[in-house]
Amino acid sequence: MALLELRDVTRRFGDFTAVDCVNLSIEAGELFTLLGPSGCGKTTLLRMIAGFDVPDSGQILLDGQDIANTPPEKRPIHTVFQSYALFPHMTVADNVAFPLKMSGKTPAEIKKRVEKALEEVQLSRFTHRFPHELSGGQKQRVAFARGLINRPRLLLMDEPLGALDAKLREDMQRELISLQKEVGITFVFVTHSQDEALALSQRIAVMNQGQVEQIGEPSVIYSHPANRFIADFIGKINLMAARVTQVSDNDMTLEIDQLGTTTLPLKQGIKTGDQGVMAIRPEQVSVHALARHAELPHAHTGKVLDFLYVGDVTTYIVELDCGIRVEALLANSSPGRARFFEVGDPVIVSWTREAAQFLMN
């Protein structure tokens, strides 16, 4: 049985449907992420799980019991917010101890559990400090410790790393993964950051316009997006308008605007006449000097319009002779990458048959 299960959960605000008939299940001990653009309904969904909002219809089951109308204080769930929500007049220890004091625990038990919680988040030396004496990352760890102190069945996190700088955010991602493995509590993480979701999650639910578009492991979401929206939202991708002109037992032929025809492995459910896009990730596009044209599959000539060097990789924008622009991501440590292509250089771009996929609009 899943720890948390949502069945046909819907929430409306007047004529606007914020969450539209969402179904998903989350297993015990899982680090699960709700990912989507601003306004997609992910925070509204989190608020209903926490008990801060009530669905208009549907069920929210925790350990098989419907808690959709249970007050938040009666749920074994804690929420960590981006703003930390620490009490400025309390020390770190008092902030972490607050839930225990409210539930009437003895001073001895409170002391023991606070020490354990601060040890888990590596803040044992900061017991007597106040929030204004802490860095952003330290404040976030205090919020995590307070969220875990009562050992909830579920820890909800609403974009908790959004206020941190990029380097600290990466460090906190690693700490979160380690912490979740150590305590074994189910984490549900809400974010609009694709990189964050891919780095943190065991599974991701991608939301758009109040609905769940796809649920899966990060590698599946990235490599095999269910549709054009997910492909375009998760990472960078080249999209070329295409139409299916022929389907055989194992292959499908696409007519690509300006580029011509190409043959790809057949996807289940695709039929002749379907409209969509051919999608290729930039890291799956190769850039070569013109001399290699004859030996390359799916090769097209063009010229370099621009490039962006960022240390370990270089992104090239190549305009093909047919007018289509293609983005390629090349590792600077690759063999033969001793020189970079310059703007205006004539080049060949190519990709393998397996790198491209057809996605419905």
From Swiss-Prot:
**Which SUPFAM superfamilies is this protein grouped with?**
MOP-like, P-loop containing nucleoside triphosphate hydrolases
Arranged from A to Z, the UniProt key words for this protein are: ATP-binding, Cell inner membrane, Cell membrane, Membrane, Nucleotide-binding, Translocase, Transport
- State the membrane topology: Peripheral membrane protein
Matching PANTHER family = SPERMIDINE/PUTRESCINE IMPORT ATP-BINDING PROTEIN POTA, SPERMIDINE_PUTRESCINE IMPORT ATP-BINDING PROTEIN POTA
Family classification = Belongs to the ABC transporter superfamily. Spermidine/putrescine importer (TC 3.A.1.11.1) family.
Listed under subunit, the entry gives: The complex is composed of two ATP-binding proteins (PotA), two transmembrane proteins (PotB and PotC) and a solute-binding protein (PotD).
From the Swiss-Prot or TrEMBL record, give the protein name: Spermidine/putrescine import ATP-binding protein PotA
Q: Which gene encodes it?
A: potA
